């Protein structure tokens, strides 16, 4: 039987609010499967040794949130299965060789192409390592491609199989007793099968866009030691205010583009570019109207 996971107060203090919420729910031992949605394609702040770093979500999960786990695996339909450390990959390879020997398969030469086949192997591996009291985290990115939204009757066989495995994990008391976490990442929760989203054993955590203070912190980090090109009429404060609704990566691109190309970063340019970015993010479903009372 696995040991009871306990939180580290110092560790949690350096995490953003949504990550602390995930940790609190996990440490309650009532939830082992989470859906991360919203601003999942952005940089995430983490404070370590008094310094704030901004990491892509995948790296944040591997290093900050699940950095103390024995095994951290990430799967997505296009990229396949990856591991946070080579030792973890070697451990999986050994387990896979044992699976092949027992079942007469040859998955060591190549994993199944279909997600349900991969999830079935992961199910076997997770159970094996949970029995060894290993601390495990599994991240499934672009989860909407593994268990897409839709009526069960219209789902393909592989999608139904994947959905059943995910539901089985959410129902499994062994996962709750063990130190195991499964995170499904889907930018738009509505694109993920509602049988998972609404499952009582699954918690949805929305990652918000940065607020004005968070944007200001990030902008100041980006501008540290550099000067905006001549003709720029924004300060860090006005940039943080006018950047409402933008991701950190979008702000980073705006600043980097201006500096590298020696182009002035102006309020007019920022307003126009912000309009284009927000409308593009919405897939043309929104028309952004710039208020004349912004400042």
Give a label for each model feature.
Residues 1-22, 31-37, 79-96, 196-295:
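AAA+ P-loop ATPase motor domain of ring mechanoenzymes
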């Amino acid at each position: 039987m696995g040991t009871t996971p306990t939180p580290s107060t110092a560790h949690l203090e350096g995490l953003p609010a949504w990550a602390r919420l995930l940790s609190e729910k996990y440490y309650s031992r009532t939830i082992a499967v989470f859906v991360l949605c919203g601003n999942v394609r952005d940089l995430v702040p983490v404070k370590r040794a008094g310094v704030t770093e901004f990491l892509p979500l995948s790296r944040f999960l591997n290093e900050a949130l699940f950095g103390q786990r024995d095994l951290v695996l990430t799967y997505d339909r296009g990229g396949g299965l990856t591991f946070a450390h080579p030792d973890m990959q070697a451990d999986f390879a050994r387990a896979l060789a044992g699976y092949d020997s027992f079942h007469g398969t040859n998955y060591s030469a190549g994993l199944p192409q279909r997600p349900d086949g991969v999830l079935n192997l992961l199910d076997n591996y997770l159970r094996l390592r949970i029995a060894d009291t290993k601390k495990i985290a599994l991240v499934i990115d672009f989860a909407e491609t593994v268990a897409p939204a839709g009526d069960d009757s219209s789902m393909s066989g592989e999608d139904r199989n994947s959905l059943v495995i995910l539901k089985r994990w959410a129902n499994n008391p062994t996962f709750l007793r063990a130190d195991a976490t499964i995170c499904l990442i889907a930018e738009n929760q509505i694109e993920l099968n509602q049988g998972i989203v609404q499952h009582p054993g699954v918690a949805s955590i929305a990652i918000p866009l940065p607020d004005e203070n968070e944007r200001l912190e990030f902008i100041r980090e980006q501008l540290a030691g550099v000067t905006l090109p001549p003709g720029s009429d924004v300060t860090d404060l006005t940039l943080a205010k006018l950047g409402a609704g933008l991701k950190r990566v979008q702000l980073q691109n705006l600043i980097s583009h201006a500096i590298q190309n020696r182009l002035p970063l102006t309020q007019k340019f920022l307003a126009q570019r912000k309009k284009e970015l927000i409308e593009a993010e919405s897939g043309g479903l929104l028309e952004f109207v710039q208020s004349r009372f912004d400042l």
